[in-house]
Amino acid sequence: MQDMLQRQSEAAATGMSHSLWAQVHGDKIAIHDPIQTRTFRQINEAANQVVRLLRERGLKEGDAVALLCSNRAEFVEVLAACRRGGYRLTPVNWHLSVDEAEYIINDCDAKALFAETRYAAATQAKTPQVTLKVSIGDDAPGFEPYAKLLGQFDGADITDPTVGSQMLYTSGTTGRPKGVYRRNTAGLMLANVAEPDDVQLCAGPAYHAAPLAFDVASSMLMGIPLVFIDRWDSEGVLKIIETYKVTRSHLVPIMFQRLLNLPEDVRKKYDVSSLRYIIHGAAPCPPEVKKAMIDWVGPIINEYYAGSEGGAGFIVSSEEWLTKPGTVGKLPDPAALRILDDEGNEVKQGDSGTLYFRVSPIAPFEYYKDPAKTAAAHRGDYFTLGDVGYLDEDGYLFLTGRTAECIISGGVNIYPQEIDNELIKHPAVEDACTIGVPNEEWGEEVKSVLTLNPGYAGSDALAKDIQAWAREHLAGFKVPRSIEFVDELPRSPAGKIQRKKVREPYWAGRARSI
């Protein structure tokens, strides 16, 4: 066992995890996706071919590669290539509008773009700095076909691997998304020996930080099969678990809720007893939902608390959580967390304050090309995600709110300023304040409170027109689910809209405001 852990760590340190597993069990299926399968040997060979392609086209270590791709084998192949070729990979959310995807591809300084061309965001984005465009799936003008290109290169292991990095984008509080750049993510990958029958399910989009880490990267590291689903279907997920005898998965609370909403006779149709480990995070989970899941699948549900920027190692098992419902885990190291008031002073045990985490010495983060935002997120050797919480007498952390303006809907982070910036371009809108309001299924939903320009009056028809206009400029999940018109918005003495005051009435009477 120790020998295998050592081999895993050494392979991960150079980005060669699939090379290790190609040697150990090369003919074992590594990827099941909705249209194809790949063995560990095939994934490894494709990764080597992609590296050789990128090198031939002039990319050097540290250069950026953008990947706009659904949950399919090619996503893993390009990821594996960047990990061993020394490239900085940015997965792009394929739900984004053309303008949003275009901004990220350009902002990350991508020199190569691998894209599934069924998405308009891939084919219509203007990306003049990209020198290599590779189509996954259907061909498209201006793109070179993935399979045809790879066939021109040797699949044998490269002899000079250098571990790469990744940069994920998080929506910006002032409008544009920001790249969260962590230079040494390989240093965060902890080796773990899998059971011989382990199978991982990736039920969320692989471009998202949590599925990328807990489903894709962990299965790569441990050498276990990964089952991809492209779109969520509650009963379909149960069928996949039964068919592939899935043992592990990362899920988010809205997935729990949708599974629990299935009729009991439907849930009983499928054997999910193979499940041994479920991990969840990304959004607060209502205690009654989590308790119902534990009652159904057993005490196999583990919760973590962290962000793309990092965290303090909070994780809580089902057994612990049942004694402390609502907690996100016990403080693993007193030096890893500080809870501060608005003046930067430590709060007393039991009092809420802004959470600050110690910066990882292994993989510190920066907001790409934004030193001001990087500095604003830090206090010395600590940084904040903008969350508010407290530690109880036993050292368990409970979240109570957020100082940041982030909306978390179905586990997806949405920053309202980005929405406001688009809504005020509508001819009827004078000003906008977008907030998250309670939603029993999604946790929060997007609501925009608007003031109107002279000559316009609030109406259902105008609200629908503004929503339709927003759909042309924003990803669907950012479009306000509801719109309210008001005569004025509360402002600070400096004239800034006080989003917190707009939000408060919708959360009145609730134990927490997230």
Specify the residue positions occupied by each region the protein language model found.
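A short helix-loop-beta submotif of the ANL/AMP-binding
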Residues: 64, 70-90, 94-98, 106-112, ...
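Gly/Ser/Thr-rich phosphate-binding loop
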Residues: 168, 221, 246-251, 262-323, ...
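ANL superfamily adenylate-forming
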Residues: 35, 121-168, 176, 262-263
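Conserved AMP-binding A3 loop
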Residues: 39-41, 165-189
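Conserved AMP-binding/adenylation subdomain of ANL enzymes
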Residues: 185-202, 207-247, 262
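Conserved AMP-binding/adenylate-forming core of the ANL superfamily
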Residues: 10, 29-72, 76-80, 97-102
